[in-house]
């Protein structure tokens, strides 16, 4: 987006940054919606952990807000140490825990 001075406005990128567990990537950029987290390779965030369900959780974006929902997983999903049920709003800095993994939702401003 270009502002009145002709310069380009910065873009905001959101990432799930791995803070516990051994994921195939150190972070996952939240592009598109929905983002699925689970044990199967077809998930946006595939995690090799027997404590994570095949389709464990889903993150969607609506009107600039991210929501995470546990998909009836066996071991549940936590945000900031609290078990969630139903869609739960996420904010930058929130810690998402499932199985042996924890992620932090980071917001990154990129100058264009």
Ranges and model annotations:
Residues 46, 67, 78-112:
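C-terminal boundary/linker segments immediately following FHA domains
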Residues 16, 37, 55-60, 64-79, ...:
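Short hydrophobic/aromatic patches on the structural cores and recognition surfaces of FHA
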Residues 35, 42, 52, 64, ...:
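Residue-level signature for short turns and capping positions that connect secondary-structure elements
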Residues 1-48, 60, 110-112:
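Intrinsically disordered, low-complexity acidic Ser/Thr-rich regulatory segments
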